[in-house]
Amino acid sequence: MILLKRMRDDIKMVFEQDPAARSTLEVITTYAGLHAVWSHLIAHKLYNQKKYVAARAISQISRFFTGIEIHPGAKIGKRLFIDHGMGVVIGETCTIGDNVTIYQGVTLGGTGKERGKRHPDIGDNVLIAAGAKVLGNIKINSNVNIGANSVVLQSVPSYSTVVGIPGHIVKQDGVRVGKTFDHRHLPDPIYEQIKHLERQLEKTRNGEIQDDYII
């Protein structure tokens, strides 16, 4: 009964978060994120029973069919909604709270080869937009929004909005921090580096830089 209630809650979460959802049958049969979460429930139970090979086998089969990789050791709360889902990776020591929404291409990963706790903790009511990377043993507190393609390497307080590379807070407790910011103005480090090199080359042509190489 507990499992059935959880599955009903997961389906309800899909309808709340995705306006494209039309029917319960459609959600159950076609939503890969839902399939990945339900497969993880089985894999995680086996993992806790120290049946590691069976747990990993289920997680890998799920990844093959859904494109979503959730390590069986990860601890996931209620009503996790993974939308689109392709390319999502959730690491072994990651914990995720309740009512969390994750979009495609998100990585909740580590930063190196260290053992032990090495993945992020995600609080309740968190939204992580497409392509974002949350890395390391950090805490993303409750009611946080993380913008698309952001790279978050430090803990984030509750009621914050984070964007950019590296991620920085642009809104906290409903108040903007610094200048107005939206996804159209996300920093592009590659473009900035190219512009820097162009400026250096221009200085070389004008005789302002005499060295044979540019740093």
UniProtKB/Swiss-Prot annotation:
UniProt cross-references to InterPro entries, sorted A to Z: Hexapep, LbH_SAT, Ser_AcTrfase_N_sf, Ser_O-AcTrfase, Serine_acetyltransferase, Trimer_LpxA-like_sf
GO cellular-component term (any): cytoplasm
Organism: Staphylococcus aureus (strain MSSA476)
Catalytically driven reaction(s): L-serine + acetyl-CoA = O-acetyl-L-serine + CoA
Pathway: Amino-acid biosynthesis; L-cysteine biosynthesis; L-cysteine from L-serine: step 1/2
A Pfam short name: Hexapep
Family: Belongs to the transferase hexapeptide repeat family.
KW Acyltransferase (keyword) present: yes
Domain of life: Bacteria
Protein name: Serine acetyltransferase
Entry keyword Cytoplasm: yes
Coiled-coil portions: none
UniProt-listed PANTHER family: SERINE ACETYLTRANSFERASE
GO terms classed as biological process: cysteine biosynthetic process from serine
